[in-house]
Amino acid sequence: MAISAKDVMELRKQTDCGMMECKKALTEADGNFEKAIEILRERGLATAAKKASRVAAEGMVYAEYCPKCKVGVVIEVNAETDFVAKNDKFVDFVKEATKVVMLQNPADVEALMACKTEAGETVDEALKNLILVIKENIKIRRFVRYEGVCSAYVHGGGTHGILVNFETTNDIDSKDEFAAYGKDIAMQVAAANPSYVDEASVPAEVVAKEKEIMLAQMAGDPKNANKPDAVKQKMIEGKIKKFFKENCLVDQEFVKDGDLSVAQYTAKVAKDLGGEIKIVKFTRFVKGEGLEKRADDFAAEVASMVK
């Protein structure tokens, strides 16, 4: 059966697949569009399986908060190349996955893949269809979901995603000034990279380890090695305070006003708004952190193709 260019263009429009792929699928399907789409989907699934072993360390991080339902989500979806993050279909998929997490509260990524999207397909099916179009390995790596008052912030077009959870009183979270404050705190987390909310949330073993390191440094320093224990203890107390100031969010210097700590800025905003604000927890995702970056080996790729 002869396949017209018009049919090929129509199938390409429906699937976003390449012209030659569309022509081959239509030929195999004897011109039947539904069958051709099915063939392309099947090939997409096979392609996805082949690509699953390739490193996906690019992509984007996304964060969103729904004030109406008081749920916030931060998610990381990885792809093989950085330009995919600018692809509208990829971005739409990330936002749809975020919405599913927000509304259906899956326990983990595996559970998320089985959830259904607004279109009626599972997230897993939507992902495989996306791989068919984009032709890269794409993976949902991780997500965090908070219930309650939140602030969500995305930096650098998806390089960093921040979600901060608060406790408030007197409905102050509904005010525009609180939204601005929440963004400031999320940006603080993005810029200053704290490890903990406050001193109380630092594990005792972490503090003990820091003290151990400080004592070892003193022992190896001729200026401090022979100082009295009481003096060393005072020095360690000062160093621990510095550790807290650098690593605890509320103790950090506020990036937008160096005269204030984050705790002081929070207290000021709470007073101005007529309520109380407590920073409860936060999550900071950086795209691809901890993942091996893709290193292309053209010779190896060609060799694998001719086997």
What are these regions (language model features)?
Residues 2-307:
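N-terminal assembly/interaction segments in proteins that build large macromolecular machines
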